Every structure is written in structure tokens, then in C-alpha cells.
């Protein structure tokens, strides 16, 4: 029987991180997703077996996560890695002051979100472990409900709800409770993070930072900041504008 512990990471109980460092991740599509796109949508979707590098820089209770490179090859086909990189953008967390800032590209527009960091209810599955690059890692999952609005054949808007599962493999030996994409709250560094499409895996871990690296851990600057609700409104506006443009 699986031994599962529910760990809800409350903002008022954020522990002080005892280490700083820079972790380099690579992202790639899950094999079943790659096979589907290459087989079913070959005419519009390009090769998606490429990888994009990301950096997570941690300085105490502050961290920043961003892409190190983009795919340079120009093509008329869709590259999911490139799109995902733009949607992620730059993510800044300040756990002590409960601040989340994310700057990203949405439908060609640069938007910056600034709001309170969210809570994650992790399920720690302590009897599932694996060795990743000589590190003993434990499994944890986070579940959330995603709502998506679609238009049916009668031109009616329907709301579809779907459970999304995030799987993390974390290493308690590394005293950094962060990971890719702004995820945090596990008792150790997230070495691998998986959603339904992408995998993010740590490839290089360097503990302790020099002065230049510490200076990078600052929130993205913007002329205008949106909270989460304002961002959703702006996102829907840009989406509608793009859809109307495609119809004309």
C-alpha cells in the first residue's frame, strides 16, 4: 500500500532557505506526445524532439527562472517548445514577502503579472524513489482542476473541467525547496518536473552564487503590472482579437 503524506505549503509558514545556487534544466516533450504530433500533425507541427535550457537561480528566499536559449531555426511549422518558452517567460518568486512576478509573451504582446504567490498541496509518496544522476529522489504529485472554454457546434460556450497532475521528483539532500516554473514547497530541490506535455530535468547544479549571479535575482521590470484577474481579462481580449483576425 502506498504511503502518502499530504503537504500543504502555507505562505505564513515558509522556511528560510539555507542554500543558494544555480540549477540548469532542460525541457523536452514526453515521448508519447512527440509521437502523436509527429504522426498526426506532421504538416503543421515541426520537429519537437529538440530541447530548451532554463536556469533557476536561488538567492535565499528569492528565485528567478528563465529560458537560456531559443530555437534559432526559422520554419513555418509550429514548435511547441518555442511556444512554451515564450509562455513561461521569466518567473520571479519572493517567498518571504509572498510575491510572484512573471513576464511573458501572449499572442505577441508582452505582459507582466504581479500577485501573491499561490499555495501547492503536494502529496508526498514516500515509498516511490529513484536514483537520478546519483541523487536519491522521492516522488510527489500536485493535482489541480483546469477550466477551458470551448465553442460547440451550436456556437454555445461550454466550460470543460479537467484534472491536471504535476509530478515532481525531489532530492531532500539539496536544501532548496524550489523547482522549475515557480513550483516550490517540497522538502528538497525538484530534480524532475512533469506535466501532461513537458518534462523539465535538472542537468547541472551549482551551489553558492557569485556577486554577478546574485544581482540577477530581481523581479522583471515593467511599465504596467497586472494581477491574476487582470491578466485573465487581457488574455481573453487578446485571444478574441486573434480569433477574429483569423476569421477575416
Residue ranges and their predicted role:
Residues 1-24:
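Bacterial Sec-dependent N-terminal signal peptides
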Residues 20-248:
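Extended soluble regions of mature proteins
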Amino acid at each position: 500500500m502506498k504511503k502518502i503524506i499530504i503537504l500543504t505549503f502555507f505562505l505564513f509558514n515558509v522556511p528560510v532557505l539555507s542554500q543558494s545556487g544555480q540549477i540548469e534544466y532542460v525541457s523536452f516533450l514526453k515521448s508519447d506526445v512527440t509521437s502523436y504530433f509527429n504522426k498526426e500533425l506532421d504538416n503543421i507541427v515541426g520537429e519537437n524532439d529538440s530541447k530548451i535550457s532554463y536556469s533557476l537561480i536561488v538567492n535565499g528566499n528569492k528565485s528567478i527562472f528563465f529560458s537560456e536559449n531559443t530555437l534559432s531555426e526559422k520554419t513555418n511549422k509550429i514548435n511547441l517548445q518555442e511556444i512554451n518558452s515564450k509562455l513561461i517567460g521569466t518567473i520571479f518568486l519572493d517567498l518571504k514577502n509572498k510575491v510572484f512576478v512573471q513576464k511573458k509573451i501572449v499572442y505577441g504582446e508582452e505582459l507582466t503579472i504581479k500577485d501573491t504567490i499561490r499555495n501547492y498541496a503536494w502529496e508526498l509518496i514516500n515509498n516511490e524513489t529513484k536514483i537520478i544522476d546519483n541523487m536519491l529522489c522521492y516522488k510527489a504529485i500536485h493535482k489541480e482542476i483546469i477550466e477551458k472554454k470551448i465553442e460547440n457546434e451550436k456556437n454555445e460556450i461550454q466550460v470543460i473541467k479537467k484534472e491536471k497532475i504535476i509530478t515532481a521528483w525531489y532530492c531532500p539532500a539539496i536544501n532548496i525547496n524550489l523547482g522549475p516554473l515557480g513550483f516550490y514547497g517540497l522538502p528538497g530541490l525538484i530534480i524532475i518536473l512533469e506535466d501532461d506535455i513537458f518534462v523539465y530535468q535538472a542537468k547541472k547544479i551549482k551551489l553558492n552564487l557569485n556577486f554577478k549571479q546574485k544581482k540577477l535575482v530581481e523581479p522583471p521590470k515593467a511599465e504596467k503590472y497586472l494581477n491574476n484577474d487582470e491578466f485573465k481579462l487581457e488574455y481573453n481580449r487578446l485571444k478574441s482579437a486573434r480569433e477574429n483576425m483569423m476569421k477575416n
